[in-house]
Amino acid sequence: MPLKETTGKVVSDKMNKTIVVAVENRISHRKYAKTMIRTKKYKAHDENNECTIGDIVTIQETRPLSRTKCWTMVNILSKSFDN
């Protein structure tokens, strides 16, 4: 079974070796057919602490690393230039 991969934006990097990634998902309302954006936050493992807030990253599902962390950062697609 292939591992799940998804892309999102880093919204927090305050924890050591952990980032919080917000993943947006566009869905259509069943009754009204309006396109809505649902956002889900995932905690992901960042071994080298190389991500900053605003980066676009790819995360991959892995074994549970802690109570809330079961994703790992694969690569950084684009860096944030706010700093």
Curated annotation (Swiss-Prot):
Protein's cellular compartments: Plastid, Chloroplast
Domain of life assignment: Eukaryota
Pfam family, one: Ribosomal_S17
GO CC terms of this entry: chloroplast; cytosolic small ribosomal subunit
Biological process, per Gene Ontology: translation
Gene Ontology molecular functions: rRNA binding; structural constituent of ribosome
Cross-referenced InterPro entries: NA-bd_OB-fold, Ribosomal_uS17, Ribosomal_uS17_bact/chlr, Ribosomal_uS17_CS
Sorted UniProt keywords: Chloroplast, Plastid, Ribonucleoprotein, Ribosomal protein, RNA-binding, rRNA-binding
SUBUNIT field: Part of the 30S ribosomal subunit.
PANTHER family to which the protein is assigned, alphabetical: 40S RIBOSOMAL PROTEIN S11 FAMILY MEMBER (PTHR10744), SMALL RIBOSOMAL SUBUNIT PROTEIN US17M (PTHR10744:SF1)
Function: One of the primary rRNA binding proteins, it binds specifically to the 5'-end of 16S ribosomal RNA.
Protein family: Belongs to the universal ribosomal protein uS17 family.
Protein name listed in UniProt: Small ribosomal subunit protein uS17c
Originating gene: rps17
